Amino acid sequence: MGKRKANHTISGMNAASAQGQGTGYNEEFANEPLTPAERQNNKKRKKNQ
């Protein structure tokens, strides 16, 4: 079988829009300071990566 284009991509849009979060809408908030609760959670996640 030939390669098929991914079903979840929307033709005509930027290719990156189909590849996970952090593209487009969410990008504006990328450099907002974290709340103390988020910072704590971030530390825990870092260890597991």
UniProtKB/Swiss-Prot annotation:
Residues covered by region (Disordered): 1-49
Keywords: Sporulation
Keyword tRNA processing part of the UniProt annotation: no
Name the record gives this protein: Small, acid-soluble spore protein O
Similarity comment text for this entry: Belongs to the SspO family.
One cellular component (GO) term of this entry: endospore-forming forespore
Locations listed in the record: Spore core
Induction of expression: Expressed only in the forespore compartment of sporulating cells.
A Gene Ontology biological process term: asexual sporulation
Biased segments, Polar residues type: 8-20
